[in-house]
Amino acid sequence: MINRNRGSGTRVLIDNRLHQLAEELGVGFDKICSELDGYDTEARTHSAVAAAVKLNRVDVGIGIRSVAESNGQKFIHLADEEYDFIMQRSFVESKIGTDLLNVLCSDEFNSCLPPGITSYKRTGEFVDFD
């Protein structure tokens, strides 16, 4: 396998799943990881994972559907991720901020997204931390 770099969301997903597996099997997380050939080999991007698979350097890696498909690779859905825009209030209230939100919430924008990437149903909803 090829792993993702420590600190990436994908690596957190992998490690969480491996912790669950270790618990189910009644073994330590470190034991599971030590038996996975390539666990300590890291890629910094989804594209790097796909390239390693495409070049037959590894059998498997965790990445996103759009990158796998653009490389003609098969994939198995593991999880969905959510991302947020973090903005200053002054940006949100500016014309460019309003324009950005209008684009992100538009049907036209959503129809242009590659397979495997979708707009969140609550896109445009504000979460205030004041």
Task: Label every model-predicted segment.
Residues 38-42, 49-51, 84-90:
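Short, glycine/charged-rich beta-strand-loop motifs at protein surfaces that mediate ligand recognition
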Residues 69-102, 122-124:
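Periplasmic-binding protein-like
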Residues 50-79:
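A ligand-binding cleft/hinge motif common to bilobed small-molecule-binding domains
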Residues 4, 23-26, 90, 107-130:
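N-terminal hydrophobic or amphipathic helices and topogenic motifs
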